[in-house]
Amino acid sequence: MMNFSNSYRQLGSDFYEESLPTPVLAPRLLLWNAPLAEQLMIPEELGQAALAQIFSGNQLLPGSEPIAMAYAGHQFGSFVPQLGDGRAHLLGEVFDKSGQRWDIQLKGSGPTQFSRGGDGRCAVGPALREFIMSEAMYALGVPTSRCLAVVTSGEDVYRRSILPGAIVTRIASSHLRVGTFEFFAARGEHEALKRLCDYTIDRHFPELQGATDQYIRFLDRVIGRQIQLITEWMRVGFIHGVMNTDNTSLAGETIDYGPCAMLGAYDPHTVYSSIDIKKRYAFGNQSAISQWNMTRLAECLLPLINADRNRAIDQLNPLLIAYTDRFNRVYIKMMGKKLGLTSLQAKDEKLIISLLDQLKIGKMDYTLTFDLLTKSLSSEPIASQMRGQLGNYFDLWQRRLKEQGTDLQEVQTLMRQQNPLLIPRNHHIEAAIAECEQTGRVNLAEKLLHVLRAPYEELTETHLYQDPPSDGDKNYQTFCGT
């Protein structure tokens, strides 16, 4: 079935608490990710009843030794010295058919020693959101954790109202977080911190092993992955919503989809999370927050760099100072590709910023605009439409494309690789959740998943999911749930 290993347990009991999932009354398989199951070599012959027992936590597989991981974190800028998995159980690690190692984690699987009075459960809505959103992000080409299954529990959970309960099975390259490092750094446990860093290097950056400056290079690599991740978020219009350090993956993957949402009309100040009152995690602020989170990681690494704290700071500071310029280079290159620019010139940054300014002023939809610009290269009616919306800018952009001398079909191919036809629109996600909460069915979710798994292709049903809601998400809010 699944051959579990448990390498994280070898770090020692300071890193986790042993914890078993709490059995549920009547597990039922709601969603199953067949392509991912095939990648993980899960036998096809297992029936839904058996899968529901396993991925509800009711039945443990041989070799699985569940734990709740310990970590701390900065939440909205304030440090909390102990958080940990309060409603999740790491079942262990498995290798897929290509030899890649994955964590297998249940969320909503019952209370742990880190629950802080919570029930350890998850409502079906947030579980469904994470499944749909993570699959959409994967198809869009964004580094992300993924969901293998959603199992309903047959039990109610009590939130703002009484809701059906569910357990979601998440896989990730690891669940190592900035907050994991903060947990030990805050306690001054430098030996444990070194073990953790060595383990993370072994798991994610093995090429650094043995280097005399491996911990400096480690920070550099993590920063690089974060820059790549945030750039991908900006490319597709993803707003994470809760970029706390305990939600910052050292593997450079999107994790913890709780209050996430997708950008509609372009505005860098857009926030949908109900708890982000000060707009700390607004769409346009995500790179700055990532830099802030990397600074927190750097602080944890200081005792591993040099016994003299000031010297350690001097060694790491250049990486943090360079973050903004480094991000901007990657971001501008990505935005250039969205506009079909095969090689950037100094003047192109102004071209990019001018378009974003125009989108903001005109309250134009981010995804639709780039989709239509892509289509305009082979459709005169769409070109005329975009010229009407963008005015002189459209002609300026077309002149720049002609100037670079690249065949327009090649340009359009480049643009389509960057610009999806559709994204997981907030109102479609909410409709799928509402259907499931009210009827227990996932018809809308399955139809939505079908098109979201091909975001760069024009399927028969694609047009049904492209348009933003009539109110432009004006009053839309998201809430933490999983």
Curated annotation (Swiss-Prot):
Mg(2+) binds at N247, D256. The active site is at D246. It is an enzyme of class 2 (transferase). GO terms for molecular function: AMPylase activity; ATP binding; magnesium ion binding. It comes from the Bacteria. Signal peptide: none annotated. Its EC number is 2.7.7.-, 2.7.7.108. Pfam families: SelO. Nucleotidyltransferase involved in the post-translational modification of proteins. It can catalyze the addition of adenosine monophosphate (AMP) or uridine monophosphate (UMP) to a protein, resulting in modifications known as AMPylation and UMPylation. HAMAP family: YdiU_SelO. This is Protein nucleotidyltransferase YdiU. The gene is ydiU.
